[in-house]
């Protein structure tokens, strides 16, 4: 084995020279230079400074403007809530530990940080699954004239939390475990060891199949069918140009969210899968640190995409920030065709 395994950690560094110490008790400066830990801390500070206000603003603006409280927006707000969990439960912890060069909060703090990071990522993934299914059902209409209403949105939100907890909670109760990863300043699922005492191998397989592969299959199937249906409807001119434009803009926004999710999380999932399937292989701490910290940027991109691509929300946000006045006028609101409301596109 090219790393050093302890009772509740795995350091990707051989202890042949005797320098490896517990990441819960000693600085890990033998893994990387102190300035590299400082860079991680600066990065986490940036995510906190950007992630909190933009996600909080998303929630606040929706509460202030009743017209934004549409069923589809419930799912988008669910993403903002999950991102705030990551900011407060994970980012603040990682900022502090990076400044100290090791995970100063011990195994309990590691469990909490790993739980919030996993929970936030899984809520985002399953929210995208619900959005994909909503787009598929509404646009492709496999169930006749189905309308995505408030009750469906609430059930969708509940579903995302149940599935996310089904992934994030087991390591807290003995099925797998959370351990420091990479440079030992943030925590995640143990992909590094088989650890039969906690049935780690079965959990990692379960996680990759149920909480990554299946969601990806559902998302790609739904959008594959959706693209085909929209093209057919446009070719047959079954709906007005305004309706088609609105559907395309909403669908485009959700697809971009999926692409952004893949960009942030696929590198982390790929590296984790490689480490798990190549037990004992030689890799350095940076190998896992970079994709792990890059994935944390997911807390920022969803609200940014939503604000940039939804004129109605953007106008409401400007009105809120300007104390009820819109310096751009009301034309943008009336002209907006990108409202996230129930689709009326007919089946092909």
UniProtKB/Swiss-Prot annotation:
Modified residues annotated as Phosphothreonine in this record: 340, 342
UniProt keyword list: Acetylation, Cell projection, Chromophore, Disulfide bond, G-protein coupled receptor, Glycoprotein, Lipoprotein, Membrane, Metal-binding, Palmitate, Phosphoprotein, Photoreceptor protein, Receptor, Retinal protein, Sensory transduction, Transducer, Transmembrane, Transmembrane helix, Vision, Zinc
Domain of life: Eukaryota
Major subcellular location class: membrane
Annotated membrane topology: Multi-pass membrane protein
Site location (Plays an important role in the conformation switch to the active conformation): 113
InterPro entries attached to this UniProt entry: GPCR_opsins (IPR050125), GPCR_Rhodpsn (IPR000276), GPCR_Rhodpsn_7TM (IPR017452), Opsin (IPR001760), Retinal_BS (IPR027430), Rhodopsin (IPR000732), Rhodopsin_N (IPR019477)
GO biological processes: absorption of visible light; G protein-coupled opsin signaling pathway; visual perception
Assembly with partners or alone: Homodimer. May form a complex composed of RHO, GRK1 and RCVRN in a Ca(2+)-dependent manner; RCVRN prevents the interaction between GRK1 and RHO. Interacts with GRK1. Interacts (phosphorylated form) with SAG. Interacts with GNAT1. Interacts with GNAT3. SAG and G-proteins compete for a common binding site. Interacts with PRCD; the interaction promotes PRCD stability. Forms a complex with ASAP1 and ARF4. Forms a complex with ASAP1, RAB11A, Rabin8/RAB3IP, ARF4 and RAB11FIP3; the complex regulates Golgi-to-cilia rhodopsin/RHO transport in photoreceptors.
Name used for this protein in its record: Rhodopsin
